[in-house]
Design a protein with these regions (language model features):
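Flexible active-site lid/hinge loop adjacent to a nucleotide/diphosphate
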Residues: 1-68
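Short, high-confidence coil segments that cap the C-terminus of an alpha-helix
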Residues: 3-6, 203, 309-311
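Nucleotide phosphate-binding/pyrophosphate-handling subdomain across enzymes
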Residues: 7-10, 20-31, 35-36, 49, ...
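Short, flexible loop segments at boundaries between secondary-structure elements
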Residues: 38, 246-249, 336-340
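Short glycine/serine/threonine/alanine-rich loop segments
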Residues: 62, 84-88, 113
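C-terminal helical cap/extension that packs against the catalytic core
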Residues: 70-85, 89, 169-172, 225-313
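Active-site-proximal loop/hinge segments that shape catalytic or ion-binding/gating pockets
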Residues: 319
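Active-site-adjacent alpha-helix immediately C-terminal to a catalytic or transition-state-stabilizing loop
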Residues: 324-339
Length: 340
């Protein structure tokens, strides 16, 4: 209020029912994107429980929007909307997005973009603007200002592509997927990359850098492999799989803003999770060479060593802390910003 902000977009930290964003008792609109199983210690272990928490942002008389959800989750969202005396609208995927070069990679981002369009249109209508998209009409037209915003949007660490300045033929594909649903989306996205260069498979080295320190890491790794195998028809999607902790640098340790307070220090120091992942990947894909390393910096260096002079595609996924650390190290070493 002191800064006289005209429009603010606030994202919940975890959940919604008990989130600090509820300090705003009368927002102009609320939105829920695609739900997945995450933060189960606080939100519960079922999609219905998570939906209940997420719907905690709904406010009386304030328009509420949601992406398509599992039927059981959608039922909970509607029940919660009724409790809060508001109407919940399920947002369609807008056909006009097919003509937009969205600034974010990944087909699933079209769903997120649709929710953003609906929430934005509702907010702008309250501010007195006209000629806005109709949130309930999947064939609604998008004004030029909406198209420009969608094309210029950037989100680091989500379906992000970065060239490696140290090696001309090396490219980093970075996505912070860390739930079964989001890791599947990351796998599908990378599968499209693999398909584009499938004719040159013999000359392309594909490397995985993966970690997930606090969730069921083995299940996430298997989901990633199975998604890629199904999408590409190749049961050996990576020549090398590197498992490292989220520790940023070999000598300096964590960069301050990349520290996770939810990890077990002993597990990190002994590489417990990484060794378990290495064993799991040996069972998933015995043909891949598996590497266990202590830090992100060392994982990046190993990937460059393994690349030799081949065309190399490196997928980094499994953890937002891992992704943040990889971007930090790459940028500190002068590797390029993201490309479209």
């Amino acid at each position: 209020m002191q800064e006289k902000v005209g429009t603010a977009v606030l994202e919940c930290g975890i959940g919604g029912e008990y989130d600090s964003t509820n300090v705003l008792v009368k927002p102009s609109a609320t939105g829920v994107t695609s739900l997945g199983i995450d933060h189960t210690a606080m939100l519960g272990e079922t999609i219905e429980s998570i939906a209940w928490h997420k719907a905690g942002i709904f406010k009386e008389g304030v328009p509420a929007f949601t992406a398509s959800q599992a039927p059981s989750a959608l039922k909970v969202l509607h029940e919660r909307a009724e409790e809060r005396k508001t109407q919940l609208q399920e947002v369609p995927r807008y056909t006009a997005l097919d003509q937009v070069k969205l600034g974010l990679h990944g087909d699933f981002q079209m769903i997120n973009a649709s929710v953003a369009i609906a929430v934005c249109a509702s907010h702008l209508q309250k501010m007195g603007y006209s000629n806005l998209p109709d949130p309930q009409n999947k064939d609604t037209a998008l004004p030029e200002e909406f198209v420009r915003g969608l094309e210029q949007v950037r989100l680091g660490g989500r379906c992000e592509i970065r060239p490696d300045n140290a090696r001309k033929d090396m490219t980093w594909y970075i996505d912070g997927g860390h739930t079964l649903e989001s890791i599947e989306m990351a796998g599908r996205w990378f599968a499209t990359i693999a398909a584009q260069s499938s004719g040159d498979k013999q000359g392309t080295t594909r490397i995985l850098i993966f970690n997930q320190q606090t969730r069921d890491a083995g299940s996430l790794a298997r989901k990633l492999h199975d998604t890629l195998a199904a999408a590409t028809g190749d049961s050996h999607p990576f020549k090398h799989a590197i498992f490292c902790t989220n520790t940023t640098y070999r000598d300096a340790g964590f960069k301050a803003d990349l520290v996770s307070m939810n990890t077990n220090k002993d597990d990190v120091d002994t590489l417990k999770v990484q060794k378990e992942l290495a064993g799991a990947w040996d069972g998933i894909d015995p043909e891949a060479s598996v590497h266990v390393l202590s830090t992100i910096e060392e994982a990046i260096a190993r990937a460059r060593e393994l690349a030799a002079n081949d065309k190399t595609e490196v997928l980094v996924t499994g953890s937002l802390h891992l992704v943040g650390g990889v971007i930090e190290v790459l940028e500190s070493q002068g590797s390029g910003s993201s490309t479209l």
